[in-house]
Amino acid sequence: MLAEVLAAAGVLAGTWQSGPPLPVARTEVAGAVVGGEIYIVGGYLADGRSSSRVDVYSPQTRRWRRAPDLPVAVNHAMAAAHRGRLYVVGGYSTTGTLRTTYALANRRWRRLAPMPAPRAAAGAAVAAGRLYIVGGVRQSGVLARVAFAFDLRRLRWTTVAGPTPREHLAAAALGGKVYAVAGRLGGINSNQTLVESLTPGARSWTAVPPLPESRGGTGAAAAGGRLVSVGGEGPGGTIASVFAYDPGAPRWERLPDLPTPRHGLAVVGIGPRVYVIAGGPRPGLFVSGANESLDVGD
């Protein structure tokens, strides 16, 4: 019956599943997948302090474990993975907006070349052997107008074309392209529906069909061959809606709503399943350890 109702409403069928919660609830975290495991990095704690904690979730065993703490406590940082290494870039610390680049391999953090300029509340994605940092802010309230690309073989940063400036956006790689999804210009009344893509090496971003609903403080991931946009916050509170974009269509389709609406959340994809972990259940400084996943199909 539920599947029929969802189909009639233009919602793709699927059922959210709950996993064991993040051991320490946080919001404004960074997340990435390394070797089939999900790494959750930093974020705000319930008391407003930033965290350096790194927790690792195995969907196969449904268990959490600790990884070495990040060398600095951060919130609004960006994370991505490539060939068994976790990269954590930028974010806010007690000293301001960071330029830092850290890589974790063999349970040891290594500090790499810093970004050309500070970044926080941006999106991160890996495509064509480069880690892209798109959007975000140079410092609180100052939108970034260019993006950065980190060559993962030469370990060097370059400046590349940026998407339309906005912060608290999401980024993901799909089909060899980098996508910049939604975000906002400042406060939660400035949320955007804008979605753009970049082909590595191109000099400009291309607009793709916009999201059906604006959102900031959102997350996105590639799963099941589609780009999945999850959650966020707006003037009415946290956002439950979930949409999937098929580049071959090209159009957005509605998926089942997120059971625990959140902003500042980690969204990652493993195969056809999207995982949504941590975040704030209400706008502002509220924390959650929720761990929910959805099979979006192939």
Regions found by a protein language model. Give the residues of each.
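Kelch-like beta-propeller repeat domains
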Residues: L6-D298
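Bacterial N-terminal signal peptides that target proteins for export
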Residues: M1-V5
